[in-house]
Design a protein with these regions (language model features):
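Phosphate-binding P-loop
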Residues: 26-32, 239-242, 270
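Walker B catalytic acidic pair
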Residues: 250-252
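H-loop/switch region of ABC-family ATPase nucleotide-binding domains
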Residues: 281-283
Length: 347
């Protein structure tokens, strides 16, 4: 059904982290559809997504879970040991586990671990069961406008970008799918094209937006929000986002015109209905609410709130509806604004 006709992947089902970056110990269950991560800055939303993405990438034989994690977090001296949570109880060992329907992969490392030389658990079975998995991570900052020669500059050590930026450029450069667009794929592309006013073109390692019959525009000259929409167009067009793939999107609402937020919510729900497992982190009330408003009865949506308890430990709460989250900084801020607005009106 629909255009996303790839192999149905094995959705990720949970992540466990102990003494890893900001986490003392946490278990986060994932829904097989759209997972919306909320929480204030510094509670590890992006960390969880990067860790899950590293596990997805490790489904390929030539990618190691620990090395990918290191390249996504970019600690000093590429030392994974620097990702150990420096807590007061003296435990200097971190453990991480990512599970899917079919397999699991884990790693253990300590502050003394050299480079990314972590101990990996169950890697072979993970590679065997998950080898068909495609995953893509869209970072919060738009990068396609800087794609030209970025790989080379990073390799030479002239600039530092973590792997999420290099990976998204590589994914966007994939040769456009030669197949005629199916009705379902066309539906997505038309919606996105209307917003971004054009199609993406790649020439000499540089990205352009081509509006209809007009001359192509350098990505630098296109508003950043539109570049994000154009990137999504490209990933659907070239087949990177298909049934069974996993999409991680860090703050999709950043720099996007508020009038396009409902369309963005609708697209995420449409992709979820095509069996793409999605993780988005957001601070945006409108995106969170529009996902709620646009969902259908069949939509598989889970809200995940990360928050600090009284002791400062990061905890996790999940709910099937946005309003049901007890720890919800987005809602709290919205209510506060509403109360202040009422107060002004009553003066």
């Amino acid at each position: 059904n629909g255009y996303l006709s790839g192999v149905i992947g094995m959705p990720l089902t949970k992540i466990e982290a102990e003494n890893f970056t900001v986490f003392k110990d946490i278990t986060i269950p994932f829904g097989k559809g759209l997972n919306v991560l909320v929480g204030e800055n510094g509670v590890g939303k992006t960390h969880i997504m990067k860790l899950a993405y590293a596990a997805c990438k490790a489904s390929k034989h030539d990618v190691s879970f620990s090395q990918k994690t290191t390249m996504l977090f970019r600690p000093d001296q590429s030392s994974i040991g620097r990702l150990v949570n420096r807590n007061k109880n003296g435990n200097n060992t971190a453990k991480v586990l990512v599970e899917s329907d079919a397999a699991k992969i884990g790693m253990t490392f300590s502050t003394k671990t050299r480079k990314w030389d972590a101990e990996i658990q169950a890697e072979e079975n993970w590679e065997k069961q998950m080898s068909d998995l495609t995953s893509v991570f869209i970072p919060a900052k738009e990068i396609l406008s800087n794609a030209w020669n970025l790989d080379a500059a990073v390799k030479m050590g002239n600039v530092e970008f973590d792997d999420s930026y290099l990976d998204i450029i590589a994914a966007a450069k994939i040769d456009i799918s030669r197949d005629v667009d199916s009705a379902s794929r066309k539906k997505y592309l038309d919606i996105l094209q209307k917003i971004s006013n054009g199609k993406v073109a790649l020439q000499d390692d540089r990205f352009y937006l081509k509006p209809g019959t007009q001359a192509k525009l350098e990505f630098n000259l296109v508003a950043e929000g539109l570049r994000k929409i154009a990137l999504l167009w490209q990933l659907i067009k070239n087949g990177t986002l298909e049934k069974g793939s996993v999409l991680f999107w860090d703050e999709p609402e950043a720099n996007i015109n508020p009038k396009y937020i409902p369309v963005l919510a609708e697209l995420l729900i449409m992709l979820e209905s095509e069996r793409v497992q999605i993780f988005v982190s957001t601070h945006d009330y409108f995106l969170s609410k529009y996902i709620e408003v646009k969902r259908t009865e069949d939509s598989n949506i889970q809200y995940i709130s990360l928050y600090k308890d009284e002791t400062g430990k990061i905890q996790c709460e999940t709910a099937s509806e946005f309003e049901l989250l007890e720890h919800n900084t987005i809602m709290d801020t919205f209510r506060k604004l509403y109360r202040e607005e009422i107060g002004v009106a009553l003066k």
